């Protein structure tokens, strides 16, 4: 543990004082963690993993191993106790695992089959096809949020640099910014950059650039309400803590959860926190699609027509107010399935 923490800190070019300030932990404690004279708590381990970009599973295994050795390492019955504990842990793990509904599992199985087919035809990938689908994604994602530009107008703004008569400057910026944000998440995917607070804030900064420059890439400082929803986002003083928990949840589940469900969960959790004054929906969908791209899937394009938008909002509302995410997970899985089917049909497979 001590070597893992020290090496990770030095690789990040941080001093113990800087780590302490960023995490709100006493500098003396950081030094003790690295010397091995003090063990961090679970919460401190999770925060250190997020800040120092250490794989959470790796550091948690080391932490638990040292915790076990400290408690029973020298006891004559240690091995026997571990064997009994292993069986109990296996049993509890089986009991605690949530069973997916048949409908959701069937869609995930269909997605797996479509992805296998897609992977076998990667050679047919076309820049022009990708460009066209990304254009559609920008159009639909902005349409969900009330942007009135048509698909053709969106194309003219992005690819021809034209100004559309009768459309506001904000609508033009929303189109340009979203397209640049897509390019940004594709770059993150290609570089295999881990998802963390810095990258989420960077995505949001692109979305609001030139629209709300003072709020772009910053958590909100005021309370907000979501029009048409009974869900009340957390108070502004809670946002930073909620976002810490958001990234801890991601690190804890990123290696064990189905990628479609992981992406959908991150989408729902981020938009429920509503950490920004504006641009929460677009940012949440981009984070979701970054996760999908990182796992070899394609962008799940949620349509902005009235029927699709209402289905999307209702599924979110149910997740936020009734603590039932089934409809939302089904909705996102269906969107990815339809996106895969369309992509395969375009390349003629």
Each model region followed by its residue ranges:
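FIC/Doc superfamily catalytic core
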Residues: 66-76, 86-349
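Conserved hydrophobic/aromatic packing and binding residues within compact polymer-binding modules
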Residues: 5, 19-20, 30-33, 59
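Helix-turn-helix DNA-binding elements, focusing on the entry/boundary residues of the two helices
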Residues: 5, 16, 27, 42-45
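Short basic helix-loop element that most often maps to the first helix and adjoining turn
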Residues: 3-22
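Recognition helix of helix-turn-helix/homeodomain-like DNA-binding domains
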Residues: 24-39
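DNA major-groove recognition helix of helix-turn-helix/homeodomain DNA-binding modules
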Residues: 43-58
